[in-house]
Amino acid sequence: DITDTASIQKLIHNCDAIIHTAAIAATGKKSIPLIKATNALGTKLILELSVQAKLDPIIYVSSQSVLHPPPDGKYTNSCPISPNLLGAYAESKAEGEQLARNFQEQGKPIVIVWPSGIIGPDDVGVSVAANGIARLLKSPILPLPKTGGILMHDVRDLSKVLCKSLSSGLGPRRFGVFGHYLNWAETENFLNEVTGRKIRTVRLPNAVFHALGRFGDALSHLHVNFPLDLATARFMTTLVPGDDKSTRESLSLEWRPLSDSFKDTLLWLTRKGMLSKESIPAIFNSPK
């Protein structure tokens, strides 16, 4: 329980370092109370107790949403926390990151890592991104906005970043893991190629796309599950590329191709029973 001091103290006893990834990562209005009650407080306790215990390094996995929208139209390792955050999740992560940055200014060995959208196989649950991929490939028609796009990377690349960040004695550091950006036209072509079938899409004005998000928020109050909320809709229409070259150079890494990540994710989703083999003929009907 990351909101319980005794639980955390027991966890970090005799530890040299810590990686803090735990958070409520969900969308929709019904998730807001749990997000607010868990993320910021949990991060505060973990960072403060880890600093007191003199752990090195103390790795805080933040979120690229904390930097959105970036001031210069691109996410970088030098971006400030955004003053115009979209949604309760971003707000909760920003509150934790502000504390992490304060500790960095004091010279504490805090490492801040910003993942973008995370995909890949073998999730211990089924993430928001994986659910979204399964849902869109089962949809008869996919509504897309006019602007924005997707920004994604592979969970296995993120794990390498976290492992390589575990060296002690290096002080405060910041690593963006922004990955691959595709605008919506590129995303449509990419999905057609990686699945081997024509994805039917309809391009909507951003105002209409945002209205769908508001509709989703309204339905959530009635406990009706809808695949879009306003914060997500706004995020999707304003997403921009990131520059993580300094991260890759510092840690001697290169990100795996997005097509490989998607194919592995789709194979895993079929094993989970969330997608049919017929929905991705490029993988299951290709020559052996």
Please identify what each model-predicted range represents.
Residues 41-89, 111:
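Conserved Rossmann-fold NAD(P)-dependent oxidoreductase catalytic core, especially the SDR/UDP-sugar
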Residues 98-122:
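Conserved beta-loop-beta element that borders a ligand/cofactor-binding pocket
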